[in-house]
Design a protein with these regions (language model features):
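Structural motif
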Residues: 42-47, 100-111, 163, 176
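Short glycine/proline-enriched turns and hinge-like loops at secondary-structure junctions
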Residues: 69, 86, 103-104
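Hydrophobic core segments of beta-strands in well-ordered, beta-rich domains
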Residues: 5-14, 18-46, 56-64, 77, ...
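Beta-rich accessory regions
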Residues: 85, 111-208
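Conserved Ser/Thr-centered positions that define the repeating blades of beta-propeller domains
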Residues: 1, 45-51
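Surface loop/turn signatures of beta-propeller and other carbohydrate-active proteins
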Residues: 1-26, 37, 55-78, 118-140, ...
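Gly/Ser/Thr-rich phosphate-binding loops and adjoining beta-strand/alpha-helix segments
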Residues: 81
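Short loop/turn segments that connect beta-strands within beta-propeller blades
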Residues: 49-52, 114-116
Length: 208
């Protein structure tokens, strides 16, 4: 590894302080890279051909869902609807802190379309969808190169109290990885998150 002499490769043009947590993925239809960056109360989209020179494309998030102090750790994946690979939508995952329904930080998501430049949400701005209703679920990110499935893993804690939890060697832990999918219910599209099948190998015996 050789540190790039022209770092940082991307800075906010408006001098924004909360500009971080970049997620980069390959957008094959246009043979380019796309980067999503959390920028205060929105996510900004950039593209690049060489991973060094980045161009601003669009933003999304302001006024949508829960409007917290800040958005963090964005991610976005394209998923089949109800298992049908011929019908797909994008899921934009956003971690928010604070102001969540059950207190502190949590993970919300938006479903919609992405044309390589701009994300268009399916729902109205006042609609909020939570990825997990557990209290300790934050900073959800997806793995790359997981073949024909999408696997995500969250941080198992909450900014409401993580700094006062007694600890020595580490600050909390990750939750179990889960496989993501899109499903319809009553005409509405939702993101499912089920523990990956590999977790079954951790079970050694059953007790009634």
């Amino acid at each position: 590894f050789t540190k790039y002499e022209k770092n940082p490769i991307l800075c906010p043009s408006d001098g924004l302080k909360d500009f971080r947590d970049p997620k980069v993925f390959r957008y094959e239809p246009e043979d380019k890279w796309v980067m999503i960056v959390s920028a205060d109360k929105e996510m900004r989209f950039y593209d690049s051909k060489n991973l060094k020179d980045w161009n601003y494309m669009s933003s999304f998030g302001e006024g949508y869902g829960v409007q917290p102090c800040q958005f963090e750790c964005p991610d976005m994946v394209e998923l089949p609807i109800d298992g049908d690979i011929n019908r797909k939508k994008w899921a934009l995952i956003v971690n928010v802190n604070p102001g969540c329904y059950f207190g502190g930080s949590a993970t919300q998501y938006f479903t919609g379309n992405f044309d390589g430049t701009k994300f268009i949400c399916d729902n109205q701005p006042n609609v909020t969808k939570w990825l997990d209703w557990g209290k300790d679920h934050y900073a959800t990110v997806c793995f790359s190169n997981t073949s024909d499935r999408t696997v995500a893993i969250p941080w198992m804690s909450n900014w409401q109290y993580c700094n006062i939890v007694p600890t020595k060697q580490f600050r909390s832990a990750n939750a179990l990885p889960r496989e993501l999918g899109l499903y319809t219910q009553d005409g509405e599209l939702y993101l499912s998150a089920a523990p990956v099948a590999e977790t079954k190998t951790l079970r050694k015996e059953n007790k009634e």
